[in-house]
C-alpha cells in the first residue's frame, strides 16, 4: 500500500461525470445479467477506483480478465480514474499467452472474477521494473496484436489520442449522420481495439448494450437481439456482417440506423449487397497504432474504398523508393496526427522502425498498399508484408510459423493466407522431422491452440516432403496453394461415388460450399475440414433455409460430421411428425 496520488481526471472520465449529472437515471449499460443507470455506473466505477488507488501508482498497468459483460467497462473507467493503464485479456486465450503478456507487460494488478461470489477481485502481481512509455503522454491502454517474433506486441495509446478518436467519430459520423442518441451495441471483443470506441460512447451519454458471447455466435439470435432492444447503432466486421445479412439483419431490424463496419477489407460482392440496404453503413479503416480508425466513408457506389482521413489525421503515400507518390500511383500508407499511438511497450527498436519522422512530422508506417482515386478516396490494395486479417484480428504469419516450428515432429513449416467463402483463412504446410514420429494434424492443431488464440490457428493443413522455393530462393506461396488445391481434388474424386442418404447429400453440399472443399466424406469433421466460428455461423443460416429443425452452434459441435448431423436431423424430423 502507498500514499494515494492526486491528479486531474482523464477526459473520458470527466465527460462521464458530466453525463451522469445530466442523465443520472438514464440507462448507461446493460448485459444479460442486468443493467446500470449512469448514477449507478459512476458509483460502481468510483468504488473500484478507490480500491485500485490503494495498490497502484499512476501509470502502472492493470490487466482485466473477466467474462464478457458490464464489468469490463466498469473496470476500464475505474482504472483510468485511478491513474492506471487498462490492459484487456481474453478468457479464450491460452493460459501461456496470458501469462506471457502479464510478465512482459509488467502488470501490477489483475482484475478478475472472484471464485467465492463471482464479484470483482484484485490480485497484486510481483513488482518488477517497469519500462517507460515510448513517448511523452499519459497512456490510457495497451492492446496486444500479433508480432513477428512469435510473441504478441503491445500497442500503447494515450488518453489524448483516445479522446481525439472519440471526438472524430462523434463529429464526422454520429453528428454528421444524426445518430446521437438511442441504444447502441458493442459486438467487438473487448480485446479488439474498436471496443474502446464503443466503451467511450457511455461517457457521451449513449446507452450501451453488451452483446453476450452466446448471442454473438448465433446469427439469428443476434439479429433478434438487435431487433428486440431497438438498437440504432452496432459495430461489425465484414465477414460477420455477411452472415447477418443472410439472417435478415436489414429486413428485421427496423430501428437500426447506423452500422460501423471495420476490421478487415470489404469485398466487391458484400459492398454491392450493403449498398442496397436501408441503414447507413460506414466503412472505417485504421491500424491499432493510429488509435483504432484513420479514415471512413459511407458505403455507396460500385467500388469498395476506405474513404478519406478524419480531420485530425494526415496521410502520406510513399512509393518503393521512399518518394511521395504521384497522383494515382500506389504506395505504402503512412499516417500522422492526433490519433497516433505512443509506440510499442518495451520495444524501442520496433517503435523506431515503424514510427518515423519525415519533414519533422512523426508518422506510422502502416504496411498497407493504397492508392488515391480521382475523387480523393483511398483504395486499399493489400499488404507490403506478411500480415493478414482474420475476423478483424491482425495476424503476422511469422508469429504462427514460429510457434508451429516449436511443435514436436515439425522440421519446417509455412503459413499461407487462403481465401475462403467466410473470409480469410490460413493454410499450414508441414515438413516432418524424419527422426521423430509424425503427429496428426488434429494433434498439431490442439498443441498450437495451447499457444495461440483460436483465430490464429490454421484451418487447412497439408504434409510436404519439402517447402517449394522460387528462383530467387524465397518461399513459393503459389505452389503451396496449388499443391493443396490438387490434393483436395484427388480427395473429391475418392469420395464422389460414395453412397449417401438424401439428407447427407444435402448437408454435404452445404459443407462443400461453405468450406470450399471439392468433396467431403460423410465422416468428415466440420472443424477438422477447415470450419471455424464464422463458417459455423454461415452453416446455421444455410441450414435454416433447408430444414425446419432449430439448429444451434452447440448442435454443430455435438454432431460434427455429415453422417451424424444427417442422422440427428432425420430422427428429429420423425419425432416431429409422430
UniProtKB/Swiss-Prot annotation:
SUPFAM superfamilies linked: Acetyl-CoA synthetase-like, ACP-like
SMART domains: PKS_PP
A GO biological process held by the record: antibiotic biosynthetic process
Entry keyword Phosphoprotein: yes
O-(pantetheine 4'-phosphoryl)serine: modified positions: 533
Listed GO CC annotations: cytoplasm
Residue span, Carrier domain: 498-573
Domain of life: Bacteria
Requisite cofactors: pantetheine 4'-phosphate
GO molecular function list: phosphopantetheine binding
One Pfam family it belongs to: AMP-binding
Job of this protein: Involved in dapdiamide antibiotics biosynthesis. Activates and sequesters N-beta-fumaramoyl-DAP as a covalently tethered thioester for subsequent oxidative modification of the fumaramoyl group.
Name of the molecule in the record: Dapdiamide synthesis protein DdaD
Source organism of the structure: Enterobacter agglomerans (Erwinia herbicola)
Highest classification ranks of the organism: Bacteria, Pseudomonadati, Pseudomonadota, Gammaproteobacteria, Enterobacterales
Gene name tied to this protein: ddaD
Amino acid at each position: 500500500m502507498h500514499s494515494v496520488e492526486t491528479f486531474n481526471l482523464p477526459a473520458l472520465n470527466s465527460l462521464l461525470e458530466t453525463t451522469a449529472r445530466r442523465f443520472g437515471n438514464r440507462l448507461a449499460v446493460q448485459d444479460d445479467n442486468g443493467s446500470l443507470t449512469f448514477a449507478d455506473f459512476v458509483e460502481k466505477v468510483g468504488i473500484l477506483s478507490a480500491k485500485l488507488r490503494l495498490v497502484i501508482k499512476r501509470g502502472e498497468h492493470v490487466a482485466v480478465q473477466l467474462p464478457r459483460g458490464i464489468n469490463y467497462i466498469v473496470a476500464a473507467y475505474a482504472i483510468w480514474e485511478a491513474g492506471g493503464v487498462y490492459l484487456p485479456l481474453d478468457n479464450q486465450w491460452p493460459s501461456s499467452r496470458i501469462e506471457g503478456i502479464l510478465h512482459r507487460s509488467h502488470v501490477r494488478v489483475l482484475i478478475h472474477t472472484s471464485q467465492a461470489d463471482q464479484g470483482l477481485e484484485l490480485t497484486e502481481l510481483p513488482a518488477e521494473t517497469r519500462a517507460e512509455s515510448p513517448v511523452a503522454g499519459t497512456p490510457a491502454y495497451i492492446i496486444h496484436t500479433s508480432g513477428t517474433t512469435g510473441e504478441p506486441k503491445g500497442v500503447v495509446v494515450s488518453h489524448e489520442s483516445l479522446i481525439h478518436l472519440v471526438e472524430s467519430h462523434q463529429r464526422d459520423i454520429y453528428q454528421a449522420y444524426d445518430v446521437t442518441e438511442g441504444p447502441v451495441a458493442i459486438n467487438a471483443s473487448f480485446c479488439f481495439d474498436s471496443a474502446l470506441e464503443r466503451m467511450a460512447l457511455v461517457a457521451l451519454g449513449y446507452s450501451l448494450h453488451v452483446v453476450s458471447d452466446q448471442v454473438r455466435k448465433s446469427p439469428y439470435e443476434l439479429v433478434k437481439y438487435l431487433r428486440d432492444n431497438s438498437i440504432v447503432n452496432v459495430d461489425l466486421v465484414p465477414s460477420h456482417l455477411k452472415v447477418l445479412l443472410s439472417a435478415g439483419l436489414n429486413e428485421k431490424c427496423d430501428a437500426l440506423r447506423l452500422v460501423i463496419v471495420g476490421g478487415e477489407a470489404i469485398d466487391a460482392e458484400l459492398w454491392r449487397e450493403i449498398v442496397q440496404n436501408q441503414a447507413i453503413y460506414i466503412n472505417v479503416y485504421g491500424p491499432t497504432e493510429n488509435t483504432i480508425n484513420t479514415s471512413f466513408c459511407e458505403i455507396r457506389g460500385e467500388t469498395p474504398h476506405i474513404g478519406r482521413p478524419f480531420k485530425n489525421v494526415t496521410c502520406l503515400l510513399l512509393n518503393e523508393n521512399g518518394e511521395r507518390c504521384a497522383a494515382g500511383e500506389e504506395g505504402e500508407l503512412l499516417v500522422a496526427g492526433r490519433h497516433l499511438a505512443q509506440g510499442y511497450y518495451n520495444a524501442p527498436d520496433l517503435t523506431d522502425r515503424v514510427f518515423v519522422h519525415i519533414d519533422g512530422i512523426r508518422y506510422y508506417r502502416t504496411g498497407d498498399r493504397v492508392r488515391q482515386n480521382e475523387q480523393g478516396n483511398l483504395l486499399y490494395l493489400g499488404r507490403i508484408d506478411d500480415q493478414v486479417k482474420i475476423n478483424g484480428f491482425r495476424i503476422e504469419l511469422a508469429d504462427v510459423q514460429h510457434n508451429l516450428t516449436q511443435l514436436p515432429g515439425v522440421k519446417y513449416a509455412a503459413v499461407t493466407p487462403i481465401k475462403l467463402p467466410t473470409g480469410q483463412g490460413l493454410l499450414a504446410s508441414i515438413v516432418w522431422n524424419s527422426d521423430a514420429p509424425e503427429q496428426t494434424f488434429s494433434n498439431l492443431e490442439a498443441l498450437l491452440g495451447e499457444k495461440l488464440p483460436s483465430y490464429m490457428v490454421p484451418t487447412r493443413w497439408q504434409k510436404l516432403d519439402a517447402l517449394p522455393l522460387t528462383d530467387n530462393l524465397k518461399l513459393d506461396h503459389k505452389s503451396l496453394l496449388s499443391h493443396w488445391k490438387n490434393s483436395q481434388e484427388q480427395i473429391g474424386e475418392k469420395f464422389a461415388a460414395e453412397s449417401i442418404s438424401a439428407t447427407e447429400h444435402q448437408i454435404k453440399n452445404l459443407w462443400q460450399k461453405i468450406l470450399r472443399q471439392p468433396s467431403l466424406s460423410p465422416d468428415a469433421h466440420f472443424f477438422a475440414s477447415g470450419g471455424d466460428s464464422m463458417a459455423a455461423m454461415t452453416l446455421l443460416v444455410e441450414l435454416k433455409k433447408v430444414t425446419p429443425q432449430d439448429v444451434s452452434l452447440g448442435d454443430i459441435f455435438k454432431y460434427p460430421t455429415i453422417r451424424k448431423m444427417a442422422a440427428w436431423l432425420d430422427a428429429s424430423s420423425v419425432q416431429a411428425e409422430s
